[in-house]
Amino acid sequence: MGARGAPSRRRQAGRRPRYLPTGSFPFLLLLLLLCIQLGGGQKKKENLLAEKVEQLMEWSSRRSVFRMNGDKFRKFIKAPPRNYSMIVMFTALQPQRQCSVCRLANEEYQILANSWRYSSAFCNKLFFSKVDYDEGTDIFQQLNINSAPTFMHFPPKGRPKRADTFDLQRIGFGAEQLAKWIADRTDVHIRVFRPPNYSGTIALALLVSLVGGLLYLRRNNLEFIYNKTGWAMVSLCIVFAMTSGQMWNHIRGPPYAHKNPHNGQVSYIHGSSQVQFVAESHIILVLNAAITMGMDLLNEAATSKGDVGKRRIICLVGLGLVVFFFSFLLSIFRSKYHGYPYSFLIK
């Protein structure tokens, strides 16, 4: 037994320990350094992201919509890392630009941002900012933005897609429309809260006071209340005001017209079906009144018993008013509802 175990012990004693090849040490050292560098780089990215989010939260605590210049835009929006969405309004608010639509859009944008800032769902995943043309001309050129205002969504990862640019001409720039678009792009739902407006209540109180005072002064002679012509005129004025969009103007407060800052051309009719100017309401009111007058003349020519020649002239005048102004009204409708196939005389 002892003789058998002796050769085995001699063979075990004769074995030499195995060592790694000499050329593998640099490889292991390089792999170790690479792991350390990757870990350090990841930590650096996390620290940079935390600093960016902290800075954005600080700006948001001061203002719901913070301004950005070229350097801030490149650092907080274009450069990674990012884990937040950014809504940016590209605008031109300087007085020399004479962009009335920009001011109105800015008010709606501010209402939306305030609604998000003071909501219970507010978090560091969505921020609102704006870039003025006079403070970031290079950004406008880089993104090929030729008109203002323009709303864009910059996602946490990747580049903005076509749907990340808000279709202002088709949808309008109301806070509710912007909130719906943001919900589609970011899955963040914002409930819009508008500040109370007491101008309507004050105007109604003044109107009631005026009517009450008039009735009190004429309390001994109230025959004018039964005047059919007077009530008919009042009814027509109310109908013309409501059908021309005066109530929409009262709620939204649009500008009277829009002057293009590039060529100075003034637009009295907005190209979108969701937005209108005050001048547009006045134009529609006049057109409706002219069509009504034409219909009244046609009715007068058909029912009166006067001279036939005079009735024929009244009929032709009434028909001309209806045909021309209805054609004009239909052309305005076509210009706002793109793709509407029908027209009459005027295209």
Curated annotation (Swiss-Prot):
Residues 1-41 form the signal peptide. GO terms for molecular function: oligosaccharyltransferase complex binding. One of its GO terms (cellular component) is mitochondrion. The keyword Electron transport does not apply. Pathway: Protein modification; protein glycosylation. It is found in: Endoplasmic reticulum membrane. It comes from the Eukaryota. One of its GO terms (biological process) is protein N-linked glycosylation via asparagine. Residues 218-221, 298-312 are cytoplasmic. Pfam families: OST3_OST6. Glycans are attached at N83. The chain crosses the membrane at residues 197-217, 222-242, 277-297, 313-333. Disulfide bonds join C99-C102. It is a multi-pass membrane protein. CDD domains: TRX_family. Residues 59-187 form the Thioredoxin domain. Keywords: Disulfide bond, Endoplasmic reticulum, Glycoprotein, Magnesium, Membrane, Signal, Transmembrane, Transmembrane helix, Transport. Residues 42-196, 243-276, 334-347 are lumenal. Belongs to the OST3/OST6 family. Acts as accessory component of the N-oligosaccharyl transferase (OST) complex which catalyzes the transfer of a high mannose oligosaccharide from a lipid-linked oligosaccharide donor to an asparagine residue within an Asn-X-Ser/Thr consensus motif in nascent polypeptide chains. Involved in N-glycosylation of STT3B-dependent substrates. Specifically required for the glycosylation of a subset of acceptor sites that are near cysteine residues; in this function seems to act redundantly with MAGT1. PANTHER family: DOLICHYL-DIPHOSPHOOLIGOSACCHARIDE--PROTEIN GLYCOSYLTRANSFERASE-RELATED, TUMOR SUPPRESSOR CANDIDATE 3. Accessory component of the STT3B-containing form of the oligosaccharyltransferase (OST) complex. OST exists in two different complex forms which contain common core subunits RPN1, RPN2, OST48, OST4, DAD1 and TMEM258, either STT3A or STT3B as catalytic subunits, and form-specific accessory subunits. OST can form stable complexes with the Sec61 complex or with both the Sec61 and TRAP complexes. The association of TUSC3 or MAGT1 with the STT3B-containing complex seems to be mutually exclusvice. This is Dolichyl-diphosphooligosaccharide--protein glycosyltransferase subunit TUSC3. It comes from Bos taurus.
